[in-house]
Design a protein with these regions (language model features):
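Acidic/histidine-enriched, glycine/proline-rich intrinsically disordered or flexible terminal extensions
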Residues: 97-112
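Short, surface-exposed ligand-recognition loops at beta-strand->loop->(often short) alpha-helix junctions
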Residues: 9-19
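Short, solvent-exposed aromatic-acidic interface loops
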Residues: 10, 44-47
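An amphipathic, aromatic/His-enriched active-site/gating alpha helix that lines ligand/cofactor pockets
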Residues: 23-40, 48, 56-97
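Short amphipathic
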Residues: 4-6, 93-100
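Active-site-flanking beta-strand signature of metal-NTP-handling nucleotidyl enzymes
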Residues: 1-8, 54
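A short, structured loop/turn motif at beta-sheet edges
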Residues: 14, 60-62, 101-102
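Short, flexible turn/loop "capping" segments at secondary-structure junctions
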Residues: 1, 46-49
Length: 112
């Protein structure tokens, strides 16, 4: 599954935020919660998208969200706190995508 968190960056802080992400990509990967694989941070460009950035993580199952909640690695927590210094106060909007081959579809029965 692909978990995508969308959020905005405070005015005048985008270059600083991008440097923070680039400088800490390795640490984000190495200190991530069990089951979480960092896929990167992407910027919405040319007016496409209602947010400034999207942060993408690959996970295997819903239990990985519990691992995220319970993760207490000091480096991870510090990175999360530092990253939040760049973001605006409105809630981040997240999307969870599942591969087509791993998606279960339920459809109503056809009426006679």
């Amino acid at each position: 599954m692909l978990w995508m968190s969308n959020y905005n960056i405070k005015e005048g802080r985008m270059k600083e935020y991008l440097k923070f992400v680039k400088d800490n990509e390795k640490a984000l990967r190495e200190h991530a919660p069990k089951g979480w694989k960092f896929q990167g941070v992407y910027c919405y460009v040319l007016g496409f998208g209602p947010y400034h950035v999207a942060e993408l993580w690959e996970i295997s199952d819903y239990a990985d969200f519990d691992a995220f909640r319970n993760h207490n690695d000091p480096t991870w927590l510090k990175l999360m706190e530092q990253g939040m210094e760049f973001t605006t106060n409105e809630p981040a909007v997240a999307w969870l995508l599942r591969e087509v081959g791993d998606t279960k579809i339920t459809e109503p029965k056809k009426k006679p």
